């Protein structure tokens, strides 16, 4: 009997240990290669390749519906690769939608979580709820900057790291908002979009201090992640894909821009905490919304509807 109990306890200990390891990742900013490799490890761990959108060993991935804890940690490394400093920042991310819920200062294990994630806890940390939410609307207002034109390089990430490590209290300050805008862009948004990954990664090997500048096109991608996620699974070789102002003319164009999409037909991906204009990257509220093929083009339904309406009015 004791042997049976021991084996059962050992089984659950192993399962628990695997789950703990599985929800901790490292994002290494030491070089462009280590950065991209780190992103790919996370994508592969949480996503499944779509065989219909694959070329030359590269695939579009869809987030698995998953089981167990919906959170994972991303430990930031390599911001100062020569000195090996600045390794105490951890971001806590929701698995099913890649929302960054807050950050952990690992020197004291305090978890500073955004107000809209006040229900979120993470093992081994003490939670402090910030006074502002995680929406881009709030972060840009408090930071006093727009994402369009925002510049990010190794120096600005170092400054952002130090701002987060020196923070205490519940106030969402300007420096924290700016820091989180930068880190969310080069973590969560880079996980979602190869276009953002590609734009930023080259700065890591550039000794001149050149910055990645977030373009209007980059921002447009981030604001349409939910719509893209709903439409792209229906791509089967159509001539092109249209979602709002976004247009892809081939599989390679899709893969060059998008890396990881939501599972829009799994209920957990469609749960919104705030108004849709605050979280425009969510899946459409109606999980049944799919892409529409018209004249050999795969359309987002609202984009096609708007165009057909304009044609009707003009005629």
UniProtKB/Swiss-Prot annotation:
Changing residue 253 to D: 225-fold decrease in cytotoxicity, probably due to reduced translocation across the ER membrane. It is an enzyme of class 3 (hydrolase). Keywords: Disulfide bond, Hydrolase, Protein synthesis inhibitor, Signal, Toxin, Virulence. The active site is at residue 189. GO terms for molecular function: rRNA N-glycosylase activity; toxin activity. It comes from the Bacteria. Residues 23-273 are annotated as: A1. Changing residue 248 to Y: No effect on enzymatic activity; 10-fold decrease in cytotoxicity. Residues 274-315 are annotated as: A2. Disulfide bonds join 264-283. This is Shiga toxin subunit A. It comes from Shigella dysenteriae.
